[in-house]
Amino acid sequence: MASRQNNKQELDERARQGETVVPGGTGGKSLEAQQHLAEGRSKGGQTRKEQLGTEGYQEMGRKGGLSTVEKSGEERAQEEGIGIDESKFRTGNNKNQNQNEDQDK
């Protein structure tokens, strides 16, 4: 029990010195803050995946993976002839809204 407490104190001290001690906890100023950041980032990504569906989430990752400091993922995809199907990005609510707009035309 004391060993676990010492380990936690050591990790907290390293976090306070600016080291990332929890995967996904970048930016947290303490062990607890890093744990909360990592949990929130994980939940945010999972929520987005649920909204977009697996295909949309993969397309978005493909586009994001092409981006650089100089160019957006869209610009790089166009230059390199890589097709990105942005229709897969739309969430369930957007799909319904777009269908309604199409009917109005």
Swiss-Prot record:
UniProt-listed InterPro entries: LEA_5, Sm_Hydphi_plant_seed_CS, Small_hydrophilic_seed_prot
Induction (UniProt): Down-regulated by drought in 30 days after fertilization seeds. Not regulated by drought in leaves, cotyledons, hypocotyls and roots.
Top-rank taxon: Eukaryota
Ranges of compositional bias, category Basic and acidic residues: 7-17, 38-52, 71-89
Database matches in Pfam families: LEA_5
Coiled-coil stretches noted in the UniProt entry, renumbered to this chain: none
Tissues in which the protein is found: In seeds, expressed in the embryonic axis and in the cotyledons. Not detected in leaves, stems or roots.
Disulphide bond pairs: none
Annotated stretches, region: Disordered: 1-105
Chain intervals with Low complexity compositional bias: 93-105
Function according to Swiss-Prot or TrEMBL: Late embryogenesis abundant (LEA) protein interacting with non-reducing sugars and phospholipids.
Note: Belongs to the 'natively unfolded proteins'. The drying rate significantly affected the structure of the protein.
Family that this chain belongs to: Belongs to the small hydrophilic plant seed protein family.
Name of protein: Protein SLE2
Species whose genome carries this gene: Glycine max
Gene: SLE2
